[in-house]
């Protein structure tokens, strides 16, 4: 078994933790298999991250949710399961804390885990002639205005039916996984991971009826600019972004790929949500 470790090598805490994790994987696999199958570790600091994944049987993300999303994008392309160790300030995708290292590795080596599948979004931007942007997202697609630009007027369609024109700063289209990310900050609903849905949440809608919509996962979501706008951007999972033309069409629908997350002790979602948000508040107060 070969494990690929992906992390931010510019963070000292991550580098130190990777060393401990590597030693634990090799030592525990040697002990549990009586030397018959020692697990191998590929450190992404020594390779390009996608190259590290090419030879791996599973990936481990070390860091926060941002690191996990980037690792997960590679895992989806390689059809690999991914496990997340949490080192950040708020982790709802990363199940395991850094203090759980040996216990987690032992359960992993012994095969005592399950694979949880999550849906993805397929995002396309069409300029009227061809697709100019095609990405997969685990959390969300965001269509938003530039920092200094005016209010945007966005037409929303679901399965070809016109829903409304939203005067707003943008619209977030998220999976159930992304419902606890940017969508939640914009006032969107919290959706349990087991429910495959698409959540549509306007950002700072300029009227009182700008509520979120929960659509079926099979729905086709389409966004167009009702009025020309100079600075509009589409972003996938917060890191893949491009400026779109005034007549462009943004389409979000269920992706063919699935994210496969390794779960050892499947957490109670609401307990994890409460614990993580409480930890974040405590850390913010301690920094003041």
Q: What does each of the following model-derived ranges do?
A:
Residues 1-58, 62, 98-114, 125-135:
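ATP/NTP phosphate-donor binding region
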Residues 61-65, 72-74:
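N-terminal glycine-rich "phosphate-gripper" loop used for MgATP/nucleotide binding
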Residues 65-67, 90, 177-179:
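Short glycine-rich anion-binding loops that position phosphate/pyrophosphate groups of nucleotides
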Residues 70, 74-85, 90-92:
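Gly/Ser-rich helix-loop-strand patches that form or flank binding pockets
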Residues 92-169:
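Catalytic core of DAGKc-family lipid kinases
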Residues 143, 148, 159-162, 211-288:
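ATP/nucleoside-binding phosphotransfer catalytic cores, i.e., glycine-rich phosphate-binding loops
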Residues 156, 178, 234:
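Short aromatic-centered micro-motifs
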Residues 165-168, 172-209:
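Gly/Ser/Thr-rich active-site loops/lids in small-molecule metabolic enzymes
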């Amino acid at each position: 078994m070969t494990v690929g470790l992906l992390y931010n090598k510019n963070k000292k805490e991550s580098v130190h933790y990777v060393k401990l994790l590597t030693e634990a994987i090799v030592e525990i696999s040697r002990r549990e298999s009586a030397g018959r199958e020692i697990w191998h570790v590929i450190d992404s600091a020594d390779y390009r991250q996608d190259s590290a994944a090419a030879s791996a049987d599973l990936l481990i993300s070390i860091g926060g949710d941002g690191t996990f999303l980037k690792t997960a994008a590679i895992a989806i392309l390689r059809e690999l399961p991914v496990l997340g160790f949490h080192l950040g300030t708020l982790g709802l995708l990363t199940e395991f804390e850094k203090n759980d290292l040996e216990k987690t590795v032992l359960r992993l080596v012994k095969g005592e885990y399950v694979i949880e599948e999550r849906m993805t979004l397929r995002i396309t931007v069409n300029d009227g002639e061809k697709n100019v942007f095609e990405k997969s997202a685990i959390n969300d697609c965001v269509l938003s205005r530039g920092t200094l630009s005016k209010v945007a007027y966005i037409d929303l369609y679901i399965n070809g039916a016109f829903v409304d024109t939203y005067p707003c700063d943008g619209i977030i289209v998220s999976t159930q996984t992304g419902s606890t990310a940017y969508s939640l900050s914009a006032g969107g609903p919290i959706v349990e991971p087991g429910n495959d849905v698409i959540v549509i949440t306007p950002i700072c809608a300029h009227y009182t009826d700008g509520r979120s919509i929960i659509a079926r996962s099979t729905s086709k979501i389409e966004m167009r600019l009702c009025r020309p706008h100079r600075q509009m951007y589409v972003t996938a999972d917060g890191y893949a972004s491009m400026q779109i033309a005034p007549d462009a069409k943004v389409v979000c629908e269920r992706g063919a790929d699935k994210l496969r997350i390794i779960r050892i002790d499947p957490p109670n979602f609401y307990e994890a949500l409460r614990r993580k948000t409480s930890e974040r508040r405590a850390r913010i107060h301690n920094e003041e």
